[in-house]
Amino acid sequence: MTYKLRPNQVIKKLGGRIIYLVGMMGSGKSTTGPHLAKLLKYSFIDQDELIEKVAKSSVSQIFREEGENGFRDIETQVLKQIGQRHSLVVATGGGLVTRSENWGVLHQGIVIWLDPNRELLFARLKSDKTVVRPLLDNKDPKDVLDSLIKQRYLSYAEADLHISIERETPEEVALVIFKKLSEIIRVQED
């Protein structure tokens, strides 16, 4: 039996299931997500941006005022709201996977782990001055990154798809995901 990438069949077989992109901060969830959404004819949501709208505060301000646990509480509430919808590609926060209660929502959709190599991840975080990363504030970023990767690895590994990233562009990563989606939902050639 052969399988072939047929965009309309892939979209139909997905049946509106939400695609959740998980991975470390800087893994490319927010940049890959819009490209994947376009391929799937879905809408795109950046969960951190939605949290900022709901909380009327920036992620870094929530971390300062409420602490990480306070932020994670809001993140879980927003995830539950997102989970009520359909036909979305969602760029989640890097630590969303650390709460087991979130997996009840995530497993209703398809979870895709974006996993750039450590050097690429660190280079992205170092070069991106537009995004504040509260967990990296006032600490050695490499040590923090290594620690977070170690803490979250098994949680990320629960994803339905694991996408290793070397130097691919967000557009290329979206195409790889689309192809792998067609394989896991087994779109048969007519």
Curated annotation (Swiss-Prot):
Its cofactor is Mg(2+). It is found in: Cytoplasm. ATP binds at G26, S27, G28, K29, S30, T31, R133. The keyword Manganese does not apply. GO terms for molecular function: ATP binding; magnesium ion binding; shikimate kinase activity. Substrate binds at D48, R72, G94, R152. It catalyses: shikimate + ATP = 3-phosphoshikimate + ADP + H(+). GO terms for biological process: amino acid biosynthetic process; aromatic amino acid family biosynthetic process; chorismate biosynthetic process. Its EC number is 2.7.1.71. Keywords: Amino-acid biosynthesis, Aromatic amino acid biosynthesis, ATP-binding, Cytoplasm, Kinase, Magnesium, Metal-binding, Nucleotide-binding, Transferase. GO terms for cellular component: cytosol. InterPro entries: P-loop_NTPase, Shikimate/glucono_kinase, Shikimate_kinase/TSH1, Shikimate_kinase_CS. Mg(2+) binds at S30. Belongs to the shikimate kinase family. Catalyzes the specific phosphorylation of the 3-hydroxyl group of shikimic acid using ATP as a cosubstrate. This is Shikimate kinase. It comes from Prochlorococcus marinus (strain SARG / CCMP1375 / SS120). The lineage of its organism: Bacteria, Bacillati, Cyanobacteriota, Cyanophyceae, Synechococcales. The gene is aroK.
